[in-house]
Curated annotation (Swiss-Prot):
Taxonomic superkingdom: Bacteria
Similarity-based family: Belongs to the GatB/GatE family. GatB subfamily.
Name of the protein this chain belongs to: Aspartyl/glutamyl-tRNA(Asn/Gln) amidotransferase subunit B
Gene expressing this chain: gatB
Stated role: Allows the formation of correctly charged Asn-tRNA(Asn) or Gln-tRNA(Gln) through the transamidation of misacylated Asp-tRNA(Asn) or Glu-tRNA(Gln) in organisms which lack either or both of asparaginyl-tRNA or glutaminyl-tRNA synthetases. The reaction takes place in the presence of glutamine and ATP through an activated phospho-Asp-tRNA(Asn) or phospho-Glu-tRNA(Gln).
MF annotations from Gene Ontology: asparaginyl-tRNA synthase (glutamine-hydrolyzing) activity; ATP binding; glutaminyl-tRNA synthase (glutamine-hydrolyzing) activity
An individual GO BP term: translation
Signal sequence, start to end: none
Catalytic activity annotation: L-glutamyl-tRNA(Gln) + L-glutamine + ATP + H2O = L-glutaminyl-tRNA(Gln) + L-glutamate + ADP + phosphate + H(+); L-aspartyl-tRNA(Asn) + L-glutamine + ATP + H2O = L-asparaginyl-tRNA(Asn) + L-glutamate + ADP + phosphate + 2 H(+)
Cysteine-cysteine disulfides: none
Subunit field text: Heterotrimer of A, B and C subunits.
Organism in which the protein naturally occurs: Mycolicibacterium smegmatis (strain ATCC 700084 / mc(2)155) (Mycobacterium smegmatis)
Enzyme Commission identifier(s): 6.3.5.-
InterPro entries for the chain: Asn/Gln-tRNA_amidoTrfase_suB/E (IPR017959), Asn/Gln-tRNA_Trfase_suB/E_cat (IPR006075), Asn/Gln_amidotransferase (IPR018027), Asn/Gln_tRNA_amidoTrase-B-like (IPR003789), GatB (IPR004413), GatB_Yqey_C_2 (IPR023168), Gln-tRNA_amidoTrfase_suB_CS (IPR017958), Gln_synth/guanido_kin_cat_dom (IPR014746)
């Protein structure tokens, strides 16, 4: 199937009327440890290619791996947050395959003895209900390198004239979280897939184990989809759509595969068990035939001891598990007294935690929401970054709010102060001073500007004296322009009306 043949797809409502989708989600999360999984190389995104490598992560002869303790603790915390059983004995295994992004020609992973098993995540849906997704396992492994293919129209290896390998990512610690089959979702399957990945992403952020930047590959999702006729017990043949790199794409990929597979089955064909590539135009294309575990020839990793976390360690780490983000948001919503719609907008903007942190600095939630949910969202969109990537902190936003509350800044001038902070000019009060933005509080200075504006506009003065007090707005505007917005508009209006006998 390609984008050009979408007319051949079965209507989605028709699909769910006759077939039952079965999904399975495999999510890879890169851990934000200081170093890689089995060596001392820095774990950092965006470095020059092949500068964060060593004999261990390049798989050179004689180099031996040493397990990263912080990665193990992060894996245990993830397992606990997913309500998993932490196994008392976990073993690493070699997953053998040959591909240019794998310098050792095998990947150190976990096979039949993972660190966490049999969990679940209660996923919040848009209508306020939850859907329990059962977790089969969460296991540790190392990431592969990254390939860049040149000369191919698709950016993939097929048709490429040159392939470049960057091994900076090779050996970065990963947690792969695998669900049990998700059944019974029906027409909500695409929504539930997206909601699950969304919830997982929020959970990883709350745990502070990963930045889960899907655009940078620190969170990657593979969606498995199969169809079975309504009432059938046996699962259909599944496909696995690899490396879906946005929340919206997760939903689109599942929906597309359901429609595509239904078209294949309706035509009397057989769904091929294969991996598929997702295209941003909203369709999937064939990748390779899907391997089985036997194809990888797993065997125990001889250079690493088993992982045997003590009960004391597990219980200590259990105390570090935070409140689930969506439950925290519900509590915060009740505290703030905002509607579901307002809260949803804040969630979609990624502003909830930022607003909460700003409130913690002693300002009202209303003022904090106004900044993070409006002006700063616009600035983030203009810069093409996430809201929490803006170079301004909740403490700095709170400082701006306090300057307004203290009468030192107007809302209009406050926006200029925030722009100065974003530009790296310093703390809010310093920016206010350096830019000369503080409100003028001296009545004699304001009165002089008022007198000048009145003298320049005698016709407007006569209107005000005649009772048309709304005409005072023109004088107020002239004064604000003359003072470059640094006068208190309310005080200016009082002085104008008083001068015209309308106080």
């Amino acid at each position: 199937m390609t984008a050009a043949t979408t007319a051949e797809l079965v209507d989605f409502d028709d699909v769910v009327a006759r077939y039952e989708p079965v999904m399975g989600m495999e999510v890879h999360v890169e851990l934000s440890t200081a170093t890689k999984m089995f060596c001392g190389c820095a774990n950092r995104f965006g470095a020059e290619p092949n500068t964060l490598v060593c004999p261990v992560c390049l798989g050179l002869p004689g180099a031996l791996p040493v397990l990263n303790e912080a990665a193990v603790e992060s894996a245990i915390r993830i397992g606990l947050a997913l309500n998993c059983e932490i196994t008392p004995w976990g073993r690493f295994a070699r997953k053998n395959y040959f591909y240019p992004d794998q310098p050792k020609n095998y990947q150190i992973s976990q096979y039949d003895e993972p660190i966490a098993v049999d969990g679940y995540l209660d996923v919040p849906l848009e209508d306020g209900t939850t859907w329990r997704v059962e977790i089969e396992r969460a296991h540790m492994e190392e990431d592969t390198g990254k390939l860049t293919h040149l000369g191919s129209d698709t950016g993939r290896i097929a048709g490429a004239t040159t392939s470049l390998a960057d091994y900076n990512r090779a050996g970065v610690p990963l947690i792969e979280i695998v669900t049990k089959p998700i059944e019974g979702a029906g027409a909500r399957a695409p929504e539930i897939a997206r909601a699950y990945v969304t919830a997982l992403r929020q959970l990883m952020r709350a745990l502070d184990v990963s930045d889960v930047r899907m655009d940078q590959g620190s969170m990657r999702c593979d969606s498995n989809v199969s169809l079975k006729p309504k009432g059938a017990k046996e699962f259909g043949t599944r496909t696995e759509t690899k490396n879906v790199n946005s929340l919206r794409s997760v939903e689109v990929a599942v929906r597309y595969e359901m429609r595509r597979q239904a078209a294949v089955l309706d035509a009397g064909g057989t769904v091929t068990q294969e991996t598929r590539h997702f295209h941003e135009d909203g369709y999937t294309s064939p990748g390779r035939s899907k391997e089985t575990a036997q194809d990888y020839r797993y065997f125990p990793e001889p250079d690493l001891e088993p992982v045997a976390p003590s009960p004391e360690l597990v219980e200590r780490l259990r105390t570090t598990i935070p409140e689930l983000p969506w439950l925290a948001r519900k509590r915060i919503q009740d505290d703030w007294g905002v509607s579901d719609e307002v809260m949803r907008d804040l969630v979609n903007a990624g502003a909830v935690e930022l607003v909460a942190a700003t409130v913690d600095h002693g300002v009202s939630s209303e003022a904090a929401r106004a900044w993070w949910g409006n002006f700063l969202v616009q600035k983030a969109n203009e810069a093409g970054v996430e809201l929490d990537e803006l170079p301004i902190s909740p403490a700095q936003v709170a400082a701006v709010v306090k300057l307004v509350d203290e009468g030192k800044l107007s809302n209009k001038l406050a926006r200029q102060v925030v722009e100065g902070v974003l530009a790296g000019e310093g703390e809010p009060e310093q920016v206010m001073t350096d830019r000369g933005l503080a409100l003028v509080r001296d009545d004699s200075v304001i009165q002089a500007a008022v007198d000048e504006a009145l003298a320049a506009n005698p016709d407007i003065v006569e209107k005000i004296r005649g009772g048309k007090v709304q005409a005072a707005g023109a004088i107020v505007g002239a004064v604000m322009k003359a003072t470059k917005g640094s006068a208190d508009a309310a005080r200016v209006r009082e002085l104008v009306l008083a001068a015209c006998g309308q106080s």
